Swiss-Prot record:
Protein name, entry field: 1,4-alpha-glucan branching enzyme GlgB 1
Subunit structure: Monomer.
Top-rank lineage group of the source organism: Bacteria
Pfam families per record: Alpha-amylase, Alpha-amylase_C, CBM_48, GlgB_N
GO biological process: glycogen biosynthetic process
Record keywords, A-Z: Carbohydrate metabolism, Glycogen biosynthesis, Glycogen metabolism, Glycosyltransferase, Transferase
A GO molecular function held by the record: cation binding
HAMAP family to which the protein is assigned, alphabetical: GlgB
UniProt GO cellular component terms: cytosol
Family from the record: Belongs to the glycosyl hydrolase 13 family. GlgB subfamily.
Length: 732
């Protein structure tokens, strides 16, 4: 034993350091705690508030009792110059033996820190956050957080009674990262960071921005994630994904809110339960993809996920991160792609989140004219800061690489692109050239899309962008933003307004039906009938349709027929596929009982058949981005509210003729010019009895007559059903 060298221990404590440790203010705990060289070997200091006694257990088994210091919880003593040790701690409730967190050197490599500071660490959650690791044979968790302006950071959790005095962290100055390896802490541990700002003021405890797992709301703690990787079984899907998601492939997306698609006994399904029920349904309906409203962890369920704080953690509302991986895996095994809504524009002001994270505007702009979004009461990311843009890009890569997600739908792009978005004069700051474009965001989006294309080939990036900003889907090399697709908000607004008009007035708004083809090839588009169109007093898709009950259903069927044959990928929000009559309510499940009603079941059958038609006929998807794939046949018959157009595929693909009558008046002998003679099959009719229609049509086929019309030598005399869409294709 070395008790003889303990007489001078009380003189080894600096009063200022003792006070700073006791008040959880010391910014360099490693300078005080742990074992430091001394005249007699090493002098060990520990600070374990609440402990009754502490000993050092040396590698050779010798036990050195540490003397109590000048403050409760402080213990110190002399150790030999060499050799390891463990701490044996006596707590009021028992004894614990563990390694000393302050016996370990710096954890993150200089290269990691360089990548973090440059915003280029694509596996950011492998460096920052909470990672279960083994250091010098000791198992534990390495905590690391970016907080360059904090004067002190400690990790607090259920492993230290949430005591900010227990585990102050080490600052790695070159990157502004604080780190600490805490032995014996493993998966499932709850934790936060306790920070002091640059002037020493204590901040609210913060959740980990890079945590891979979070506590179920309303809890706000982060959780140490299980490091065991998911065992994927989707090799076949991943090998063919690039082909399945190519520009000339069909893409029909079913958008869902995971918490309200189906509820059992008033409760959300978990990821496994959702997979059990959703995947067979999506496959049966013929959708090629599901799109999940944001699954990143978010504090307020009423935001639907669009105000996230945990950009690396699938929300705990539906289970564990591995549960989410299992869901994606099972989708892939059934040939269904998974797109996730992702929010890099803004974040909520919750005290435990990113707001004023280290006592300064770290993730957000300091000036509210740049950093505060009044429409949503949220803070706006500073995309011009390397570490922030790198944080966001790493979040995107986390979902695309770790979870095999097939694409991201980037939310609120327009709000990022323009400095004056939703602001009046004097409420925004111009760019360096005096303009309204946000150059920093443009650079961020370009780099994001370049990184995705380089590191996750075959994944798609989709922009929700509601303005005419040029080149959203153009290549970055050609001055574009580099997205694969863009939501066609113009098509959606125009056609929904048209469809909501009484048919007697539609002749005066015919351009709303046809105008989309003027710009249809300026970008690569998705036609979105999303959740945004069935909330906030807009009513349901069915509820927008005019007329009596029969006409509303017929209008809806005709509108869906128009959507699925118009150039552009398809997106349909859950409930729209069976004509939900009320607005979507995120607190309730969909009204599935309505499928007992043949009218709603008919709409569902129609959408199922439209999906199969869309996939079966290349003319309906192969040339969505090529003007050669579309030709108006009748685009100017405003008086009858009739449109007709040809969709054309690649060489050898049969053309498809689409004719839609947007009035309740049956058109007999309506002649349409066609490019070839012979018989044309009626392969779809929205007025079919199986869909709930009146069963008026063309008896399954029509023979072309040698009567020129619309620039063609032959034409078809057609019966156009009321408020109906028909699709024909030549035999052979």
């Amino acid at each position: 034993m070395m008790s003889g060298v303990m007489t001078a221990v009380s003189n080894r404590w600096d009063p200022g350091a003792v006070r700073a440790l006791a008040e959880a203010r010391h910014g360099d705990a490693f300078a005080v705690l742990g074992a430091h060289p001394s005249d007699n070997g090493r002098f060990l200091r520990t600070y374990l508030p609440g402990a009754d006694r502490v000993s050092a257990v040396l590698d050779d088994g010798q036990v050195v009792a540490l003397d109590a210091g000048p403050e409760p919880g402080l213990f110190a003593g002399e150790l030999p110059a060499h050799g390891g040790y463990r701490l044996r701690i006596g707590w009021p409730g028992g004894e614990q033996e563990t390694a000393d967190p302050y016996a370990f050197g710096p954890q993150l490599s200089d290269f990691d820190l360089h990548l973090i500071s440059e915003g280029h660490h694509l596996q950011l959650a492998d460096a920052l956050g909470a990672n279960v690791v083994e250091v010098d044979g000791v198992r534990g968790t390495r905590f690391a957080v970016w907080a360059p302006n904090a004067s002190r950071v400690a990790v607090v959790g259920d492993f230290n009674s949430w005591d900010a005095r227990r585990h102050p962290m080490r600052l790695r100055h070159q990157a502004g990262v604080w780190e600490l390896f805490v032995p014996d802490v493993g998966p499932g541990a709850h934790y936060k960071y306790q920070l002091r700002g640059p002037h020493g003021h204590e901040l609210p405890a913060k959740a980990d921005p890079v945590a891979r797992r979070a506590e179920l709301a309303p809890g706000t703690a982060s959780i140490v994630a299980d490091p065991t990787p998911h065992q994927w079984s989707d090799d076949g899907w991943m090998a063919t994904r690039a082909r399945r998601q190519a520009h000339d492939a069909p893409m029909s997306i079913y958008e869902i809110h995971a918490g309200s698609w189906l509820r059992e006994a008033g409760l959300d399904l978990d990821w496994d339960g959702l997979a059990d029920r959703l995947i067979p349904y999506v496959a049966d309906m013929g959708f090629t993809h599901v799109e999940l409203m944001p699954v990143s962890e978010h504090p307020f369920g009423g935001s639907w996920g669009y105000q996230p704080l945990g950009l690396f953690a699938p929300t705990a509302r539906f289970g564990t991160p591995d549960g989410f991986a299992r869901f994606v895996d099972r989708c892939h095994r059934e040939g269904i792609g998974v797109i996730v809504d992702w929010v890099p524009a803004h974040f909520p002001t919750d005290a435990h989140g990113l707001a004023h994270f280290d006592g300064t505007a770290l993730y957000e702009h300091a000036d509210p004219r740049e950093g505060f979004h009044r429409d949503w009461n949220t803070l706006i990311y500073n995309h011009g800061r390397r570490e922030v843009s790198g944080f966001l890009i790493a979040s995107a890569m986390e979902f695309l690489q770790r979870y095999h997600v097939d694409g991201l739908r980037v939310d609120a792009v327009a709000s990022m692109l323009y400095r004056d978005y939703s602001r009046n004069a004097g409420e925004w700051i111009p760019n360096i050239h005096g303009g309204r474009e946000n150059y920093e965001t443009i650079a961020f989006l370009r780099r994001l899309n370049e990184v995705v294309r380089e590191h996750t080939p075959g994944a798609v990036m989709i922009a929700e962008e509601s303005t005419a900003f040029p080149g959203v889907t153009a290549d970055v090399a050609h001055g574009g933003l580099g997205f694969h697709y863009k939501w066609n908000m113009g098509w959606m607004h125009d056609t929904l307004h048209y469809a909501g008009l009484d048919p007697i007035y539609r002749r005066y708004h015919h351009g709303e039906l046809t105008f989309s083809m003027v710009y249809a090839y300026s970008e690569r588009f998705v036609l979105p009938i999303s959740h945004d169109e069935v909330v906030h007093g807009k009513g349901s898709l069915l509820g927008r349709m005019p007329g009596d009950d029969w006409q509303r259903f017929a209008n809806l069927r005709a509108y869906l027929g128009f959507m699925f044959t118009h150039p552009g990928r398809k997106l349909l929000f859950m409930g729209c596929e069976f004509g939900q009559p009320t607005e979507w309510n995120h607190d309730a499940g969909l009204p599935w009982h309505l499928l007992d009603d043949p009218r709603h079941r008919g709409v569902q059958t129609l959408v199922r058949d439209l999906n199969r038609l869309y996939v079966q006929y290349p003319a309906l998807h192969a040339h969505d981005d090529d003007p050669s794939g579309f030709a108006w046949v009748v685009g100017d018959d405003a008086g009858n509210s009739v449109v007709a157009f040809l969709r054309k595929g690649k060489r050898g693909d049969a053309p498809v003729l689409v004719v839609i009558n947007f009035t309740p008046v049956v058109q007999h002998g309506y002649r349409i010019g066609v490019p070839q003679g012979g018989q044309w099959r009626e392969v779809f009719n929205s007025d079919a009895g199986i869909y709930g229609g009146s069963n008026l049509g063309n008896g399954g086929s029509v023979t072309a007559e040698q009567q020129s019309m619309h620039g063609h030598a032959q034409s078809l005399p057609l019966l156009l059903p009321p408020l109906g869409a028909i699709v024909l294709t030549p035999y052979g």
